[in-house]
Amino acid sequence: MARLVSTALMRGLVRSSRAPRVAAVSQPAIQQFRNYSPGLGGDSRGSGDSSSTRVAADPDTHQDFQPTSKSSNMSFDDIVAQDIKENPVLIYMKGFPESPMCGFSALAVKVLKLYDVPISARDILGDLKLKECVKAHTNWPTFPQIFIKGEFVGGSDIILDMHQKGQLKDVLGDIAQKHEQKESS
């Protein structure tokens, strides 16, 4: 593959030195490269194929490897409402608490971990519909979005400010106590 691209580049450079027009790589070589390399054919997900793949259930295939349906009766609004209701500290963030994918999400997790509270999180990068639903629910355009005791608090800047002013300790105090009691039992 590298040889194909290299040869095409060299041919294009040689031609361009002879002709007044500039052409680095011939169109057929680019097309061959795109067909060979996944993710370069215009598919932003990196799969190289913009159409979905459907696999028919094969009776010879083990049940664990047969296709499954991902449909659910819950809407994204229901999922967000349930998340907020069931989790005392919830972050909608880029990545996960163990591996944040942006500095603001990392900062929010770092500040909340200072209080030894259980942190629940959802990665908004995994589902853009969920991301848009959360933004509509809070009317807040950026992430992370942090909920404490069912109330939207804000982003990492607000959590940091509350921490620096000593307000976060008051808000998270009873959650930390419940968490300690649960662990000691």
From Swiss-Prot:
Domain of life: Eukaryota
Biased composition (Polar residues): 64-73
Protein name, entry field: Monothiol glutaredoxin-S1, mitochondrial
Family: Belongs to the glutaredoxin family. CGFS subfamily.
Function of the protein: May only reduce GSH-thiol disulfides, but not protein disulfides.
Region Disordered, residue ranges: 34-73
Residues at which glutathione binds: 94, 131, 143, 156-157
Species this chain originates from: Oryza sativa subsp. japonica (Rice)
Primary location class: mitochondrion
Glutaredoxin domain: residues covered: 77-179
Compartments (UniProt record): Mitochondrion
Segment annotated as transit peptide: 1-36
Entries under InterPro entries matching the protein: Glutaredoxin, GRX_PICOT-like, Monothiol_GRX-rel, Thioredoxin-like_sf
Record-listed [2Fe-2S] cluster binding positions: 102
Keywords: 2Fe-2S, Iron, Iron-sulfur, Metal-binding, Mitochondrion, Redox-active center, Transit peptide
GO CC annotations on file: mitochondrial matrix
GO MF term set: 2 iron, 2 sulfur cluster binding; metal ion binding
